[in-house]
Every structure is written in C-alpha cells, then in structure tokens.
Amino acid sequence: MDIQQLEVLCKQLYEATDIRIRSEAEKALVTFVSSQDALPKCQLLLQRADSSYAQLLAASTLTKLIQGLSLQERIDIRSYALNYLATVPNLQHFVVQALVSLLAKLTKYGWFDSYKEEMVFQNLLEDVKKFLQGSVEHCTIGVQILSQLVCEMNSVVEMDVQVSFSKMRKIATSFRDQQLLETFLLSCSLLVSARDNSKNISFMDESQQALISHVLRLTKNCLSFDFIGSSTDESADDMNNVQIPTAWRPAFLDSNTLKLFFDLYQILPNGLASYSISCLVQITSVRRSLFNNSERTKFLTHLVEGVKDILTTLHGLSDPDNYHEFCRLLARLKSNYQLGELIAVPCYPEAIQLIAKFTVESLHLWLFAPNSVHYLLTLWQRMVASVPYVKSPDPHLLGTYTPEVIKAYIESRLDAVPVIIRDNLDDPLDDFCMVQQQLEQLSVIERCEYNKTCNLLVQHFDQKAREYENLLQTPNANSIDITIHELQLTWLVYIIGSAIVGRLTVATSDEHDTMDAELVIRVLQLMTLTDARLPQAGCEKLELAILSFLDQVRKMHSSEQAQKANLNKRLSEVFGLTDEQMLLSFINRKIITNLKFWGRSESIITKTLMLLSELSVHFNSVRKLARLEEVQFMLTHHTSEHFPFLGTNSSLSEMRCRTMFYTSLGRLLMFDLGEDEERFYNFLEPLTNQFESLGSVMMDNNIFSNEEAKKVIIGLARDLRGLALPLNARIQYTMLFEWLYYADYLPILLRAMDLWAHDPAVTTPILKLFAELVHCRTQRLAGNVSSPMGILLFREASKLICIYGNRILHQEVPRERLYPMRLKGIAICFLILKNSLGGNYVNCGVFKLYGDDTLDSVLNIIAKLILTIEQRDLIEYPKLSTAYYNLLNCLSQDHVSYLAALEPAAFVYILKSLTKGLAALDSATYISCCTILDSIVSYIFKQLQMKVSTFPNKKLRSLNQENVQFLKVVEMNSELLQSMMSSLLNNVLQEDCRNQWSMSRPLLVLILLYEDYYRSLKDRIICAQPIEKQQTMAQWFDDLMVGIERNVSSKNKEKFTQNMSTFRRDVVNLPKSTAAFSCDRPMCDGGFEPSEPESSPH
C-alpha cells in the first residue's frame, strides 16, 4: 500500500458520507497498522504533511506500535516527534494531540530505560522547557505535552499484559517524586505571569485563551494526581482527600498559592474561570496532616475569605460552569475541615450568612444548574451532622440559617410545580434517584431546629390538602389545578417521609415524637382521601410518594431505638390504631388496595410489592403480619379477580412483579405452616385451577397461536419460582414438588417449552423456575434417603434442557439478538445442571447402573450447546461466562470422568475456553479456571499413571475405552495445555501475580506432565537474563522442585505452593534489565530515521 493510497484512505475514513466506503477504508487501515512496513510509512506520512488525517493516522499508529519497538527505535521516534512539533507550523489540534499522546506513552513505557548510562526518557521536562521559551503556539504545545504526560502517568489502564499494574505504579511513583512538583510549580509560575500581565493579554485572542486553558488544565492534572495509588475516581466526587506529598508543603503554606487562583477567577473570562475554581476544589481537599493546627487555621482562613469575597460580589456565578465548580468548592469546605475549625475562622459569621443566602437563592433558581444543588445540600448536611461534636464556645449559627434553607427547599419545589405543568418542562419528580438523594440529605438538615421544620410542613400541608379536597368536591374542577395540587402534595409527602426517618439518626424528645405523629397522621389522612378516589382516578406520582412514606414509617417502627409512645397515642386518637399490629394492618390494607386498583401501573405495583417484601422478610414483622386478617385474605384470594395484575391482560414486563409477590406470600405462608398439607394445597388452589384448565388446552394442535395460554404459562412459571424461593425447609419444599410432579403439572411446562422454545418470554421464566427447583437451598433436597425426589427432579430438569437445547440448536438467530434469543437461555441451562449436580442429592452412578440415559443425554446436549458459543462471547457476556465456568467447576470437581467422556470437539473447546479464562482480568474467572484446570490435568495424570501401572490386580486399574480415547485427544492437543503452562509460569514471573495459591496447583501437574516442555521454558527464561544472573536464576528453578514427588496429592501440591512462594519472592526482587523486557513484534527490519521533517506545504 503506497503513501498516496494511505492518504486517500484517511480522507475517506474521516470525510466520506457513504458508510460502506468508510467501512472499507477502516478495514484497509487496520490491515496497514499490523503490516511489516508500518513504521517507515508512518515517517513518510509525517514528512509529506499533505493531509492532517494522514498525520493523525501516522501518530496514532506509532502509539499502537510502541511496545513492539526496540529501545533505539523508541528514542528515534521520541526525537523525531519533538522535532516535528517544534518545526512544523500550523498543525491541526487533533494532530498535535496525537503526537503529544505518542510522546507521553513513549515516556511512560520507557521511563526506566537506560541508554548510554542516561535515563533518556526522563529528560522530557527539560526538552519541553525549550518550547516554553518560544512563541505562544510553541508554549501551548509544551504545556500540552506536560499535561498529557501527567495524565498518562496517572492512568491505571494497563497498556499491555506485559506492563503490570505494580510496574505502572513504580513508574508513576518515580515520576511523582522526581518531576511532578517541578511541573506543578512551573505551571503556577506561568499562571503568575498571566495574572501579572493580565492587562497586556487579550483573553479574547484564541491562541492566548488556548494557552491559559492548557496551563490551568496542567495545574489541575497535577493536583488530581493519584499520589498514593488509591485509584480514586474523581468523577464520582466522593469527597476524597488529595494526598499531597510532604515535599509540596512550602507551596501550600505560601498564601500566594491560594491567592493566585482566587485572583485568576476574578480576572479570567467565563469559560476559563471555572478551571481556576476546579484547582481550588483540589487545593481545598489536601490532606489535613499536611499542616499543623496553626497552619491549617491560617490556610482555612484564607480559603474562607476567598469564598466570602466571591459570595459578596457573586462575580461570575451567572455562568453555569463557574457556578457548578463553586458549589463543589463549598461542599469540599466541610468534607475536609471540622465544623469547629470553620467556626474559629474570624469571618465565619459573615461567611455562613452569605452561604445561606446563596443556598436559598440557588434553591429558588431551580431551573439553573439543577445538578449543583446536591453540593449545597451536602455542605449543610455535613455541618448539621457535626453539631453534636462541636466544642467551640463560639456559636455555629446553624440554628439561624438551616430553617431558611429548609424553607427555601420546600417552597421552591412547591412553586416549581405550576411552572412545570404550564410550560411542559421536565419534572424533577421523574428523576427518582435524584429525589431520594436530596431527601436523604434533607433528613439530616431538617433535624436542626426541628420544631420550625415541622410547623412549616404542617402549615403548607394543611393548606394544600384543604385546597385539594375542595377541588375534588367542586363539580367540573379544572383538571390542571387538581394535577398541580397532587404534585405539590407529592413533594410534601416525600419531605415529610424524610423528616420522620431522620429521627433514627438522632436522639429524639417527647416533643419531637408528638411532631412526628402530627406529620404521619396528615399523610395517612391524605392516603384515605386518595384511596377513596381510586376507582375513578388517581395520581401515580403521589401514590409513589405515599409508598415511600409508608416505607419510612416501616423503618421507624421496626427500629428498637425509636420512641413510639406519643406517636402511637396520636394514631390511636385519630385512626384507632392502638398498637404496631394495627398499624401493620393499616399498611397491608393499602398494599391490597394498590394491588387491586393499580394493576395498570408497573412502577406502583413494583413499589407496593417491594414494601410487602420488606415487611415479610423480618421475623418480628412476619410474626405480626401472619395473623392479620388482610394477610389471610391475600393467602386465600391471590387471583386475578382480586388482584388484576395476576391476569393475562398485564404486559410481559408487568408480569415480572409476580415473582416478588409470591415470594412474599410464601414467607407469610411458611411462618406457621408446619406440616399442614391441607392448608398448603388450599393456598395452591388458584394455581391448581390454572394448571387444570391448561391441561386439555395444551394438547390442542392450534395452541401455538393461543396468546392467552402463553401468558398463563409465563405467569405460572413466575409465580412458582417466587413461591419456591422461600421454601427452605425440606417438608414444605417436598409438598410443592409432590404437587407439581404427581399432579402431572411438570409435563405441561415441558410441553410449553417444546411449543415456544423460540420465544424467550416463555423459555426464560420456565428455565429460571427449574433452576430454582433444582437448587438445594439450605439442603432442602438432601437427607431423605427413602425419597426418589432428587432423581425424579433431575430427570424432569434434564428433559427440559434436552427439549430446549434440541429446539434452539436448529434456530437461526441474528447476531444482534444472539444473547436474548439464545445465550441467555443456554446460560440458565448451565445453571440448572450446575445446581442439580452440585446439590449432592443425585447419585449419578445409578443412571448407568440401571441403563437410564438421562445423564448421558443431558451432557450430550450441553456439549452441543457449548460448541454453539463463540469463545469471544464468553468474555463479552459476564452472566454467560459465570454460568459456564461455574458448571465446568462443578463437573471437574465431582464428575471429571463425564468431562473426559465428552466428544473430542467439546473437550478441546473447554481447553481453549480455559486458555481464555486464564487471560481474563476478572479474578473470579481466573481462580475458577485454575481450579478446573487443576482437576482436569490431575485426572489426566492419574489416567496416565494407570496406563503404565504394574499394580497386581490389573483389572482394578485398567483403562476403559472412553479413557483411552480421552488420552488420545489430550495427546493430540497437548499444545493447548503447554500454552496454559506457559501462561501460568509467565504469571509467576510477573510482579503482581494474581491468586498464587490457585495457579500453583495446576502448574505443578502440568510440569509433571510435560517435563521436557517445562525444561525448554526454563532454559529460555534463564538465557534471557544477563550472564551474571543466569546461574542464580537456574538455582532458583532447581529449588522450585526441591522435595516435589511425582504425584498429584494435596500434600505434594502444598509443598510446591510453598516453594513457589519463595521462588516468586526471589524473582520479583531480582533487578530487571531492559534486555530482559522484550516481546516479539511484527515490525519492519528497518529503523525509524530521526531525519529532519520537511517544512509543511501549508
């Protein structure tokens, strides 16, 4: 491929509008990147400089090739890139960025490389200083290089498996200790120059603006560096401290550093000023131990004064970016400093007043930067939470200002509703996660001056509830007015819920108890009013708020610490609810009401069932619930007549709720069921009736198109799975199984699977039901030697897998629908077989003994299903990967002979998948693969021992035909096992070896199986070392096998693990040379000439 053709392809890739042309160009360029002549052609593309896109391709290709280059080539490319950036003018910004990224990666990759006794890649800072002395454009490029270098050094993404995480940390630590502080001080000096010459700088000039922007980014990158390798996620904004090294102390003790960024904020235009606040956010978060007490006070004083000055003038806060970063700065003030320290600041009274005023105004301006409110509420939440621990004699003044904040929050939410309805704006109530987060913050803030909060809530609630009730009684009332009041009441119900749950975190008084009672009563009265309207109309958002409130009441009453005397007294006076059991009855009536009238709303049904589930999961509440009349009603009337969401008119997504419903009913039923079979079968009567009506229908030849029958099957599968989940006792579980098996209901499910195997909406619930039925949860299937239940259940589950597998194998599925249409079902089949065989309730030997082909059939179909899965899909779909490796783990532990009996193609597939698993980043997958491999190779070793055995009674030790065939397959694919040995041994030699115990066990067996190959690997590793270290390395390898016998006993493996631990310690401590760190590379024979680039034609 010539240079002109490459330039055309680049143009097509980035400019063509035809997708086909772009796709073909992309394929051709991917081929070029891996070609042997990529390196010299990249140089030619850069030298010609005819196309910016070609320059981009050259720079990005060189970046990908870094690890395949020799030290000399990397040095040459480094020199060329620096020279190119310095001498070629008017480069496009994306080309500059690509070259800057190349330089940063080269520097990181070669940080410890020595050339002619010089650490050549550690000189980049000195080279960049030459750029800083040039024009504005050169200075900008120099700053970009430093900024990208800091980002690259801070990156935890592994460049390659050969660059371990620990090596990257060593590089980052070395860079931090040698150059990061100098880089930070250099960026600060550039900012000082910009500030001092601000009158002579035109910030509207694009080049000047770009330079200042990059310098500020560089400064922030320095302050955001992962100094101690904690890998904190700055995007999460979880208030982590910045672990500034002690060597940086002078920079932070100098008050001019803080002043610099406050000054820049005042000087810089919008678009740049926010970067200076971002830097202040990081500076505010420096670790407390960097200062002593007096230094910290002085630092905090300057910080609070700077914040106060901004709040006084509100300069720049009309810009959303500035506003957002300033809110983050306010939140960090409290995250890193104690309230007592803030109170000690001389200007604290004035500052807290301004912060309160700013918060109130921000809450009322709810349309402006709504995501920033979180930081303001965080500040107030943290300050209020600290009040009990303050020992300062000075007043904290929070009692004065928090009521203002709460009032602003409540009134701003209420005032927003008419505007949202009138102008059809996005409703914040639709963002449930954000609402919940704010309510959690409010629950703390509200408890400061709680009587004021309660009085305000009562005042607003009474007014809105009265107006709402009047509207409902007014004929032909405006529906918009009704909606507005319903949404306003929704906010008030949410806020009241947050207020009463806040009592769980503080010591409450009788007065507070009475206030909570008043709030609870009002919401319950509103609930009674809205329930009376339900046959005609209802507000979904208000119902969700009431459910959230009831959940808070549940938490309050389930807490042993909460005082409830006054609350119960008021509930008794108003509603006649004299004790907790009557309150639970009241809540359950609401649950039944919702299930009856809100069947059309998936969100309300789901939240209602979640509330029922929470009530049924705790022993204390179950004990009280089980006796309630309302609960007995649910246990005897769970039909679509009383609960419409159980009918066939529900959508498929709504039917998912049914599992949760029956899990809750199952818990309530099991509480005092004991061995009462009659009561259990009475409970099952609605399900029995459905099965009986399906029995004859399912045999009809026209059933395939019967949508109602299909929905009944889906509903039954979900119901039964929900019911099976809480049946942990063997007696109750046996009742369920016998009902299913002896009433011939399982064949109906098998028939449904046969009919609708192509439809995941049917197959997934049925497969999940069987996965639960075969799960030996709390040994519910084990222990009864007189019962054939385990065998019978396994046979039915095997039939299901065989029916599904045979149908799905012949079904064509498009790639984009592969997971939902096929792979998800296959994963559940793996889970069913794993649960069956791993439950230890099926004696698999009896099948062969009595000529039953159940086990062979299911293993054969599983083998066929395995072969339909592409290896890449095992990595791409985590649930499939987990189910697959868990099944293999189960089979290899107790049923390895069945793995050996698989057809050769399936066994080879398994070996290849283990190879993939050993390269996986997920530790669970890696450990699982090591365990599976250990079982398989140990079995191979024992079979080979048996083959050459001289045991007197040869008949006991002879190989059957299956094992002879198995050993032939192993022999033909020995390179797979050898490659895994190589992978495991390579892992041992890495600095951050994972799961040493797990991987040492299969490694020993592989060494015993393939001694010659191990010897060749060992020799190659030893020869790769410098001559003076080879003898030492050889001795360490000899010591690795000291005391190791030729067997695969646990004792022998333990000894090898101990030896390997010593071996690893010695190898990791051996100083590495650059010669030893190399890999094969598909590169050209010629080097990269560091010649002068041609001048750019443009």
Curated annotation (Swiss-Prot):
Keywords of this entry: Cytoplasm, Nucleus, Protein transport, Transport
A GO term from the CC aspect: nucleus
SUPFAM superfamilies according to UniProt: ARM repeat
Superkingdom of origin: Eukaryota
Classification via Pfam families: IBN_N
UniProt GO MF annotations: nuclear export signal receptor activity; small GTPase binding
InterPro entries, A to Z: ARM-like, ARM-type_fold, Importin-beta_N, XPO4/7-like
Keyword set includes 4Fe-4S: no
Compartment list: Cytoplasm; Nucleus
GO biological process: protein export from nucleus
Gene3D superfamilies: Leucine-rich Repeat Variant (1.25.10.10)
Record's subunit section: Binds to nucleoporins and the GTP-bound form of Ran.
Alphabetical list of PANTHER family matching this protein: EXPORTIN 4,7-RELATED, EXPORTIN-7 ISOFORM X1
Protein task: May function as a nuclear transport receptor.
Membership in a protein family: Belongs to the exportin family.
Protein known as: Ran-binding protein 16
Organism: Drosophila melanogaster
